[in-house]
Design a protein with these regions (language model features):
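C-terminal structural segments of small proteins and small subunits
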Residues: 83-107
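Alpha-helix boundary/capping and short turn/kink residues
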Residues: 24, 78, 91-94
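Acidic, glycine/proline-rich low-complexity segments that act as flexible tails and inter-domain linkers
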Residues: 1-47, 100-116
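General structural signal for alpha-helix termini and helix-helix connectors
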Residues: 36-39, 70, 74, 91
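Short connector loops at helix/strand junctions that flank enzyme active sites
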Residues: 46-50, 64
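Mid-chain, well-packed structural core segment of small domains
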Residues: 57-86
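Short alpha-helical scaffolding segments that buttress acidic/His motifs in well-ordered protein cores
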Residues: 30, 34, 50-57, 85-92
Length: 116
């Protein structure tokens, strides 16, 4: 894995552990809802992760973008498909999404380089 991917995954894992130590019942339910919402249903996991990525880009949440990029990569989304996802996110979100698009491409490239 590349540096960006390793740093993000390490920090996320560390802080998820910390959060789980202190989270109250309501927060635990919210986190469980997030997990179960992305499970297979009428839409498959792959589609839900692509939707999550578009929403994350439009909302300009870099951590969320990285998370969904990783999940999309794990679900076998191709670079061609990813480029179309980026187009939709920029169309919906407007030019303010472009800085997040740049970082998303950099992160996606690292994910793809790790395959080789």
């Amino acid at each position: 894995m590349g540096k960006l991917v390793e740093e993000f995954n390490g920090y996320r894992s560390k802080m998820n552990g910390r959060i789980s130590e202190t989270a109250n019942t309501n927060m635990k339910r919210f986190l469980a809802l997030d997990t179960t919402s992305y499970a297979d249903g009428a839409l498959n996991v792959r589609t839900k992760e692509m939707l999550g990525l578009v929403a994350s880009m439009v909302l300009r949440c870099d951590d969320c973008i990285k998370y969904h990029l990783g999940k999309c990569h794990s679900e076998g989304v191709s670079t061609e498909e990813m480029n179309e996802i980026f187009v939709i996110a920029n169309l919906v979100g407007g030019s303010i999404v472009i800085p997040h698009y740049r970082r998303a491409v950099e992160y996606w490239d690292e994910l793809c380089e790790a395959e080789n």
